[in-house]
From Swiss-Prot:
A GO biological process held by the record: dimethylallyl diphosphate biosynthetic process
Keyword field: 4Fe-4S, Iron, Iron-sulfur, Isoprene biosynthesis, Metal-binding, Oxidoreductase
Name of the protein this chain belongs to: 4-hydroxy-3-methylbut-2-enyl diphosphate reductase
Function (record text): Catalyzes the conversion of 1-hydroxy-2-methyl-2-(E)-butenyl 4-diphosphate (HMBPP) into a mixture of isopentenyl diphosphate (IPP) and dimethylallyl diphosphate (DMAPP). Acts in the terminal step of the DOXP/MEP pathway for isoprenoid precursor biosynthesis.
Keyword Metal-binding listed: yes
Organism of provenance: Salmonella schwarzengrund (strain CVM19633)
Active site positions: E126 (proton donor)
Pfam family, one: LYTB
Catalytic activity reported: isopentenyl diphosphate + 2 oxidized [2Fe-2S]-[ferredoxin] + H2O = (2E)-4-hydroxy-3-methylbut-2-enyl diphosphate + 2 reduced [2Fe-2S]-[ferredoxin] + 2 H(+); dimethylallyl diphosphate + 2 oxidized [2Fe-2S]-[ferredoxin] + H2O = (2E)-4-hydroxy-3-methylbut-2-enyl diphosphate + 2 reduced [2Fe-2S]-[ferredoxin] + 2 H(+)
PANTHER family: 4-HYDROXY-3-METHYLBUT-2-ENYL DIPHOSPHATE REDUCTASE
Domain of life, per lineage: Bacteria
Coiled coil: none
């Protein structure tokens, strides 16, 4: 059995930054550190940080006065931000800068009185945070997930209308929704640069290349990870058997026993140690040395807040 690895895969710059913010805050201030929502959608990462003293909460009211609070990489609404400001809390923002970019687009539209349409998945924390940037009562903010949603949508003023997208969507699906928006609302204005982030786009491109060669594709990522789900869906659309797994223990030998080639990738919130464990598991089932495919080089780095820019080893 051949083992192929997608490239790129795993952690993106936004996830790296968010985890570093929590780790550095724990090192500097000590436990407990409160984090609103899972800092990233990965069970291994969240469990590891929880063991070190991070407490994951959903409501600001759960945080005691005087505590350290961190917003997750998915971002928060203005209402949540204002609630935190009203409390005696030290707040650090781990929102991915590429999510913040979309927040700024929504806030700008709100100030101008333009109505805005967000392409995204209902209930996802990034969507809730992005929708929560719009505050103009004279306008409106709408959520669509599919072309069908677009055709049933009614807005107040088609002449002052813009759209944005969640950063972790399927590139292909989003293109279909944008096409529908432009047909339904010919004057609609989109972002100058695509809101789907570089990491999402690159990982979907990489899984396409992987699925062209592999019989079975394993995507390392948690069930609540939007970008990981999109990778598994893409491989399945290409006619491959694909499984979304949290870790190597999820793999069943029956999945791969007849496969000549198994492809492995990982969502943007999945650490490389999980991929290495998957490789080891596949080798138990007769897999050979893992071969990494050629792919796009990623060298983007997002800095942590200056208050947390320390060598963690100095405070251990």
């Amino acid at each position: 059995m051949q083992i192929l690895l997608a490239n790129p895969r795993g952690f993106c710059a936004g996830v790296d930054r968010a985890i570093s913010i929590v780790e550095n805050a724990l090192a500097i201030y000590g436990a407990p550190i409160y984090v609103r929502h899972e800092v990233v959608h990965n069970r291994y990462v969240v469990d590891s940080l929880r063991k070190r003293g991070a407490i994951f909460i959903e409501q600001i009211s759960e945080v005691p006065d005087g505590a350290i609070l961190i917003f997750s990489a998915h971002g928060v609404s203005q209402a949540v931000r204002n609630e935190a400001k009203s409390r005696d809390l030290t707040v650090f923002d781990a929102t991915c800068p590429l999510v913040t970019k979309v927040h700024m687009e929504v806030a700008r539209a709100s100030r101008r009185g333009e109505e805005s349409i967000l392409i995204g998945h209902a209930g996802h924390p990034e969507v809730e945070g992005t929708m929560g940037q719009y505050s103009n009562p004279e306008g409106g903010m709408y959520l669509v997930e599919s072309p069908e949603d677009v055709w049933t949508l009614n807005v107040k003023n088609e002449g002052k209308l813009s759209f944005m997208t969640q950063t972790t969507l399927s590139v292909d699906d989003t293109s279909d929704v944008i096409d529908a928006l432009r047909k339904r609302f010919p004057k609609i204005v989109g972002p100058r640069k695509d809101d789907i982030c570089y990491a999402t786009t690159n990982r979907q491109e990489a899984v396409r290349a992987l699925a062209e060669q592999a019989d079975v594709v394993l995507v390392v990522g948690s069930k609540n990870s939007s970008n990981s789900n999109r990778l598994a869906e893409l491989a399945q659309r290409m006619g491959r058997t694909a499984f979304l797994i949290d870790d190597a223990t999820d793999i069943q030998e029956a999945w791969v026993k007849d496969a000549a080639c198994v492809g492995v990738t990982a969502g943007a919130s999945a650490p490389d140690i999980l991929v290495q464990n998957v490789i080891a598991r596949l080798r138990e089932f007769g897999g050979g040395e893992a071969v990494t495919l050629e792919g796009r080089e990623e060298n983007i780095v997002f800095e942590v807040p200056k208050e947390l820019r320390v060598d963690v080893r100095e405070v251990e």
